[in-house]
């Protein structure tokens, strides 16, 4: 692909209504209009993109580094068709939109809807008193947690759907059971902007997607892979997403269990403290069921340990209870996995799709300590 052949870019703003968004997206996908950029902030320096790029999605990424990802119409259509086929969606079926369009998961709902010939039911900021029904929808675990614990409008809407896709962050077994108990038909998805969103459903790669494990890391080859990382500022260059063989090596760790992909964390979730490897996610998953609140594990620099393990929690943990928890961690995860500091915070900071923002957790705690 000639990256020097260009097409213009139009930034989608919050003022755009659904008919305008769908019309512009259709033209971007069929090549009769400019590419569309979905992002929370505009980027005047991005005036054009390679001619095969139909959509640009800006994301901070899990590590907090700003990225602009260019996706082709072929990749987006491949993703939409594979998803609709997996779900058994047919022309005339409807999707509801409960996710922001500044994220690939929201954009995917639009492309799937275009494929089915129906405008999605836009429920992002709904004030409707009646409960609209949709055949399919997509949400993040935070929304699912609120639905099954608070009931109300969202739960009833999800119960009306044939299938609810849940992605953007890890879906715990406990939350999945709660969803099943609430009569929700849930499918856990795995993917990222680089893969046009979810490309693995309930551990099984969608049509056109291959998954390998390379030294513990998840590698993906797919017809739905994005094309390029685009410049975020002047002077940066366009970088291909894949290697020369068409594989995208993620920063996620995983393995296969009975033919299904199991995601166990991220490379940056594993830290070294005192020479010992510690999985932050393992610490979180172990402690969360044992306390009355949420738990996030994180680290901060330490002269002695290199990285000092700590947790922040919304729970109130008494001294005796903490000593009991330390003993349980020692037995199950090892002495090195015992957090050396514990902080109580009112709320766990999360991104727009519900992912825990560890850097913001640390900033919040530092801010409290400096007062």
Residue ranges, per PLM feature:
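AMP-binding/adenylate-forming catalytic domain of the ANL superfamily
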Residues: 333-355
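Conserved AMP-binding A3 loop
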Residues: 52-81, 88-90
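Active-site glycine-centered loops adjacent to acidic/histidine catalytic or metal-binding residues
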Residues: 62, 168, 191, 252, ...
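AMP-binding/adenylate-forming
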Residues: 29, 34, 73-79, 94-146
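AMP-binding/adenylate-forming catalytic core of the ANL superfamily
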Residues: 222, 251-337
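Gly/Ser/Thr-rich phosphate-binding loop
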Residues: 149-202, 212
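Conserved ATP/PPi-binding loop(s) of AMP-dependent carboxylate-activating enzymes
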Residues: 205, 214-246, 266, 276-278
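Conserved pre-ATP/AMP-binding loop-to-beta segment of ANL
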Residues: 18, 41-58, 90-94
